Amino acid sequence: MQTQVLFEHPLNEKMRTWLRIEFLIQQLTVNLPIVDHAGALHFFRNVSELLDVFERGEVRTELLKELDRQQRKLQTWIGVPGVDQSRIEALIQQLKAAGSVLISAPRIGQFLREDRLIALVRQRLSIPGGCCSFDLPTLHIWLHLPQTQRDSQVETWIASLNPLTQALTMVLDLIRQSAPFRKQTSLNGFYQDNGGDADLLRLNLSLDSQLYPQISGHKSRFAIRFMPLDSENGQVPERLDFELACC
């Protein structure tokens, strides 16, 4: 049984958006293959939320800026003794390739927006029970198509996100690896520190404590308050050890 729980908290709006996109893309594949109504609604609801996120900001522009920023950071390690130069060069080339693919790709999510079935389901998702067979006969007949035909269509939908997924995965991996976990101690359930221009907080907490963090702040300063899962009977120790990485 897992004894440590990892919490991540964004310290700016772009990181908040990226983590939401990452979460929703991961959710797209959780219940595949789609074999019934429940699996279909899970998939289409996540597609709909993903398109909503895309429409709120310049996702491609921010990712391209970050790909460029990560390349510049890696270039500062070129020629430094003891650093694996081949690894640095490989990462730089991977970032360049991801940027080229992303910049030449169609508008993010456009393929999904233009799909008739996705559009029909999106219109009904906000209506309680609005995806019944009599409301959405299109979805009803789609669910009775051969499994291979549905699988192929789902794979095509997900593949349309590959330029974004590839770039986002690289960026988030590099950010997460940019800082090590360090042991910290909270006093009376409270901890605060300077962020040092961090984009992301990562916090490892023992499951035994049955506590969760409430995090507030921004890239220059943040505060963490630990709360008991059982709000009535749970207790927060005077001193609590945890691991924190400011990435």
Curated annotation (Swiss-Prot):
Q: What is its main location?
A: cytoplasm
Which is a GO BP term held by this UniProt record? division septum assembly
**Which SUPFAM superfamilies does the UniProt entry name for this protein?**
YacF-like
What is one GO cellular-component annotation here? Answer: cell division site
Q: In which domain of life is the source organism classified?
A: Bacteria
Listed disulfide bonds for this chain?
Answer: none
Localization of this protein: Cytoplasm
Where are its TM segments located?
A: none
- Keywords associated with the record: Cell cycle, Cell division, Cytoplasm, Septation
- Subunit note: Interacts with FtsZ.
Q: Which PANTHER family match?
A: CELL DIVISION PROTEIN ZAPD (PTHR39455:SF1)
Function, in words: Cell division factor that enhances FtsZ-ring assembly. Directly interacts with FtsZ and promotes bundling of FtsZ protofilaments, with a reduction in FtsZ GTPase activity.
Alphabetized HAMAP family for the sequence = ZapD
Family per record:
Belongs to the ZapD family.
What is the designated name of this protein?
Cell division protein ZapD
* Organism the protein comes from: Escherichia coli O7:K1 (strain IAI39 / ExPEC)
* Classification of source organism: Bacteria, Pseudomonadati, Pseudomonadota, Gammaproteobacteria, Enterobacterales
- Chain's gene name: zapD
